[in-house]
Amino acid sequence: MDSKKRSSTEAEGSKERGLVHIWQAGSFPITPERLPGWGGKTVLQAALGVKHGVLLTEDGEVYSFGTLPWRSGPVEICPSSPILENALVGQYVVTVATGSFHSGAVTDNGVAYMWGENSAGQCAVANQQYVPEPNPVSIADSEASPLLAVRILQLACGEEHTLALSISREIWAWGTGCQLGLITTAFPVTKPQKVEHLAGRVVLQVACGAFHSLALVQCLPSQDLKPVPERCNQCSQLLITMTDKEDHVIISDSHCCPLGVTLTESQAENHASTALSPSTETLDRQEEVFENTLVANDQSVATELNAVSAQITSSDAMSSQQNVMGTTEISSARNIPSYPDTQAVNEYLRKLSDHSVREDSEHGEKPMPSQPLLEEAIPNLHSPPTTSTSALNSLVVSCASAVGVRVAATYEAGALSLKKVMNFYSTTPCETGAQAGSSAIGPEGLKDSREEQVKQESMQGKKSSSLVDIREEETEGGSRRLSLPGLLSQVSPRLLRKAARVKTRTVVLTPTYSGEADALLPSLRTEVWTWGKGKEGQLGHGDVLPRLQPLCVKCLDGKEVIHLEAGGYHSLALTAKSQVYSWGSNTFGQLGHSDFPTTVPRLAKISSENGVWSVAAGRDYSLFLVDTEDFQPGLYYSGRQDPTEGDNLPENHSGSKTPVLLSCSKLGYISRVTAGKDSYLALVDKNIMGYIASLHELATTERRFYSKLSDIKSQILRPLLSLENLGTTTTVQLLQEVASRFSKLCYLIGQHGASLSSFLHGVKEARSLVILKHSSLFLDSYTEYCTSITNFLVMGGFQLLAKPAIDFLNKNQELLQDLSEVNDENTQLMEILNTLFFLPIRRLHNYAKVLLKLATCFEVASPEYQKLQDSSSCYECLALHLGRKRKEAEYTLGFWKTFPGKMTDSLRKPERRLLCESSNRALSLQHAGRFSVNWFILFNDALVHAQFSTHHVFPLATLWAEPLSEEAGGVNGLKITTPEEQFTLISSTPQEKTKWLRAISQAVDQALRGMSDLPPYGSGSSVQRQEPPISRSAKYTFYKDPRLKDATYDGRWLSGKPHGRGVLKWPDGKMYSGMFRNGLEDGYGEYRIPNKAMNKEDHYVGHWKEGKMCGQGVYSYASGEVFEGCFQDNMRHGHGLLRSGKLTSSSPSMFIGQWVMDKKAGYGVFDDITRGEKYMGMWQDDVCQGNGVVVTQFGLYYEGNFHLNKMMGNGVLLSEDDTIYEGEFSDDWTLSGKGTLTMPNGDYIEGYFSGEWGSGIKITGTYFKPSLYESDKDRPKVFRKLRNLAVPADEKWKAVFDECWRQLGCEGPGQGEVWKAWDNIAVALTTSRRQHRDSPEILSRSQTQTLESLEFIPQHVGAFSVEKYDDIRKYLIKACDTPLHPLGRLVETLVAVYRMTYVGVGANRRLLQEAVKEIKSYLKRIFQLVRFLFPELPEEGSTIPLSAPLPTERKSFCTGKSDSRSESPEPGYVVTSSGLLLPVLLPRLYPPLFMLYALDNDREEDIYWECVLRLNKQPDIALLGFLGVQRKFWPATLSILGESKKVLPTTKDACFASAVECLQQISTTFTPSDKLKVIQQTFEEISQSVLASLHEDFLWSMDDLFPVFLYVVLRARIRNLGSEVHLIEDLMDPYLQHGEQGIMFTTLKACYYQIQREKLN
């Protein structure tokens, strides 16, 4: 043998696999022989036809042997050895199939190939007798768009037809005959068509007999929740019929549509064929007729009709003593649709008979083309209404339906003996028809059906509805049925139904759909659908009629069919329980049983005790592959037996009545059998190194195990569940949970058994075993089942079952002992039951053992060995783990039996297990009273402290245990910490202390992992930690703490206190979600407080400290108010913004400013949107108090004292027209006392004033009219005094700056350590970044990079230089761009308050100077902060020495001397707050500030602009002349786009164009320094233009320069030039005023004033 290699096949040596042995059917004694001429290739699959066969080898090649008349060469027609199909070489074939005379193959990419006989179109080729070589069949789905080629999974071939199963689980058919299932009369069909009737269903397998087809279809998912419709959607007949006679009731729910097909009227006319299949129960009731009637060939239709109706009337005459006149029960129960036209039917039948059965002469029957077809038609026609049948007969017939009719009340009649009625009662729905149809029912038949019925699933495949609620049939077994007394016949059916409903508990033991397992393993929830010719009953519908379309064989529902085989005229269905149902022709005993009739599925009786795991059906025989005791498959044959030589008696040319065991044990292990007409073939594997034997052992034991589990489920579990008084609801629920998990496990085992059977048919690679690849499926199912059964055990389930179940258990003691494998007769029933329930767990040991056996067949280094070895230990580990779980459960149960009863009820839980308790391990409470009793019980989820009649439960997830150090005086002490308690336990000895500590630690650890029920498989999860973590996640409800009473916390803990992220919820709806520290809210968090009165909630998001709101936050009130700002001790404290109401609400307003202890105090701005007023001033205790300014939307301006929210004391009031009042006020806008009123023209009144401004003022005083000659100094000084009563700029927004200093760790401005400040900045950035990571807003990449660069502190060593100044400037720009940085936050807040102050009503020209002062104040205060952070930065106005030499000297624009720095220092070299900070601050504040400038200069700007527009109407030459520009500076030529053009008198906007463009950029800059650079550049552009035209160096004098610059300013057309000029003037650095830029600015200013005075002549 080869050395063992990687794959399992190679490990064995491929020579010893897939050996082909062939037998001749019916010859005895049977001697198998090797296939003549076949070499040693491993065969995976074989298929046999009538005289030929096909082999598929492991490498995907196909060989044909036998008689091959379609081949071209004479040698190839009868080859001596199998010949290779060359057309398929290069294609990897995965499956093959043969019909009687044709073959098919499917490649791995889903293409089907056909070859052989094609007279009926069975090879999908038109007009060709033979297809000599494999030819690809084109199958395309015309419904799909675009057209898609259909990929094929499996083929099945009959005599004249072929079916293909596609990868999307649909059936495609071609060939000839009704067995195609297509609605057509045009045969042959050579283009594959979809069998529409099964479209949308999942078809698992197809099989073809000679002239019939079978399909295995997955059941639809249960529609339990949908209401059952009353009528059939297709034929509108009642789905449930009830006939209520005087003395009996018949209820039937076995409605079946004719052909199961939707019929429109037009279809009915066009295709009369569709009505050919009557509803099944009707046919079923007639089966005696068809079994016993043979109509002669030459009889006319009429004769047959009469004959059959005569049969119908007379067939039951044996028991009809009283004839009740009336309509036949059959037709009254359900109106069968009559044919549209009898003639059409006959025509159709004639057409069909042309394609009738091609009988083999060997079959011993003459061709009878018309007979079966006429038989089909008869039952469809209405019986004549006068037909007299007894009501009794109709009851018998309705009982006999093969689909299963429920009889609701017994029928009392002398004609029908009780025994017969009982026989009908005790048959299962599946067997009913079979037994009723046979003339006599033997005791064996009755016994057989009883057993079958007990095994049957209770709720599978049954419909329920309001009419049919008689569930005793399913839940209470056959025995209960015999107890219906005769007197019930007088009771109304409704009462009967009510009684039945009360008594029965419905238990569904069929597991629900389990997605994962069903996707990986074969489904057991299947239905069998059949169609085609049915003359021999091979369709299984209880009649001998053909079906043109698939129809479900109802009595196989719930039988878990996993494989179908079709012989010539019979069918076999193999179930997951290793049973075989057979139906159809039984001429030679090929069904494996002699029961009658053979038109419905009956169990084949194979004498072996073991189950069948594979079947094959030949033309007139069947093969059964069974499990044997030594796991080597045994082969049974049932069917035709040829007579021995010299024995010519015709009766010997029959068959075996019972299946015969063939002796083939010497061959090896048969993996697959295939049957043809005269021969059958087996594929055999040699058992090398025990590999094959181990695989067979695994498969056989799994199938047996499934049978045992099924028996336990049906014979023990179901009866137990249906018992009355099962105890408490909990017990019943637990038992139901056990039953449901048991069912799930049982179903999985059934699926696995089926998958192992198909695994043995294939390549048999160990690595593809489901138990290896998807071991978690099995491990989880066993674990779940063990959990449920141990829970049941702990709750005393078995003890509670004892009483109600004792009768049942006593009656079934032998069965119990047999199933549970308990041999000792003295064992108590409950113990046996206990053993029985724990039986499945043992299977894990078997898995481990078999996998280990398989592993030994591989080299130790191979991956297979490793995988098998690992899986084996996984299963073994789980088995031991579950064994421990069982012991724990028994130990816990023992404890509950001794525990005081009252406490048991509250403490006993299904999943709770006892670990240890202090009655046997001395443990006492420290400082306990002398007479107190303290009992400590450790469970897997809690530590219980019991005292007398009270107890306290401490959940383990929130319990911390630590040993006390000896210094603490606790020698054997354990300190226990829980969220609200702390106590010390003293143990008697150090050993006890260690034991308890270890037990508690392990229990806590297990509780935290949440893995107490999980097995220790997987990666290293079995490693126990020495002690549980101090920091952990857990959930806890407080019961003691007054603040937290009844609140539930879910989150992180540290040593008994919430610490880290968590959620705290109070019963009244309050909720906090965020960070905790030492048990208190601390850090960033969100808090919600419901406001029941307003049906809304208050909501806070922000920072907390020691359980209180502290730091920045946003509080949204239920009233709609929102506060954003600082908090301290749950109160608003510091800078904040309060928004009240929306613009549409009754009192919208906004306040931004300082708060102290929840009240407005200090400087603040209040915007009263309703009144259109804005107050900017001081506050105290929520009212305006002190100096302040009020502006209104009507242009009024007040500046002065406020007291208790009112203008009171001295003040100044200005109106829009510059009227001024300066004096005393007593209320808002109310003058009261001494004062001076000055008119816009300078006249003024001094005296006493009283009254409200704007509504008449009473004056007592003197009127002054200043003379024209009075100088300015004698005029009122009001305008000069105007800013005296406003709040000084440095007093504004102190809280904002204080907050920034506080963030840097300073008590006040400049009071702190620099290193500490930088540490605080780093912390602020990191925490903010962490919070941002959790928040939904994702930072952009550039923002992240900025943050990272800000975390580096700029280091400056050595003398301060321009480079270092530049570094600081860059750092500040980044910092101010990032709100997470304290400086960025400061700038953001200042921008917000500035805009809030000077936007809207605040955009008042009177406020301009205030606004400018405020900016200067910001600069001063921010510069102080910057100098604190960068101590090496020189103070304001200092000059930084230049480190690099000066660039090449540039001559001064004005003086012509070389530029000397001392005279005109450049900005950037002199350190000023505005130079450093304005570039950061001003762009953000520019819009409101510039608006104030524009308002203030409104009038003069209008005059300026009018002049600009007027002067700009002139052409260049005229304007230059008008402005007095010297002619030598006039450009003569201009270069436009590289071309030189002469300046003409009409030329406009062309001279000095570059200078004009340059000056226009002044409006796009923000800071004065940038604006000054623009002006300087403009001058240089003018200079360049003049130099170009003069071609000589010269010096500008102001007289020469001014007119030229004036021209440029005019042409630049800057709309708000005045505002620009004033802004520069107010904010430029003072040191620039006398330098070059200062002079240039003065020139611009002069131009502005000059333009206003220009008059154009």
UniProtKB/Swiss-Prot annotation:
RCC1 repeats lie at residues 60-109, 110-168, 169-219, 526-577, 578-628. Residues 1513-1657 form the VPS9 domain. The gene is ALS2. This is Alsin. Signal peptide: none annotated. Forms a heteromeric complex with ALS2CL. Interacts with ALS2CL. InterPro entries: Alsin_GEFs/MotNeuronReg (IPR051984), DBL_dom_sf (IPR035899), DH_dom (IPR000219), MORN (IPR003409), PH-like_dom_sf (IPR011993), RCC1/BLIP-II (IPR009091), Reg_chr_condens (IPR000408), VPS9 (IPR003123). GO terms for molecular function: guanyl-nucleotide exchange factor activity; protein homodimerization activity; protein serine/threonine kinase activator activity; small GTPase binding. The modification Phosphothreonine is found at residue 510. One of its GO terms (biological process) is response to oxidative stress. The modification Phosphoserine is found at residues 465-466, 483, 492, 1335. Keywords: Acetylation, Guanine-nucleotide releasing factor, Phosphoprotein, Repeat. May act as a GTPase regulator. Controls survival and growth of spinal motoneurons. Residues 456-467 have a biased composition (Polar residues). Residues 690-885 form the DH domain. It comes from Pan troglodytes (Chimpanzee). Residues 901-1007 form the PH domain. The modification N6-acetyllysine is found at residue 533. SUPFAM superfamilies: DBL homology domain (DH-domain), Histone H3 K4-specific methyltransferase SET7/9 N-terminal domain, PH domain-like, RCC1/BLIP-II, VPS9 domain. Pfam families: DH_alsin (PF25389), MORN (PF02493), PH_alsin (PF25383), RCC1 (PF00415), VPS9 (PF02204). Residues 445-455 have a biased composition (Basic and acidic residues). It comes from the Eukaryota. Residues 432-481 are annotated as: Disordered. PANTHER family: ALSIN (PTHR46089:SF3), ALSIN HOMOLOG (PTHR46089). MORN repeats lie at residues 1049-1071, 1072-1094, 1100-1122, 1123-1145, 1151-1173, 1175-1197, 1198-1220, 1221-1244. GO terms for cellular component: centrosome; cytoplasm; cytosol; dendrite; dendritic spine; early endosome; intracellular membrane-bounded organelle; lamellipodium.
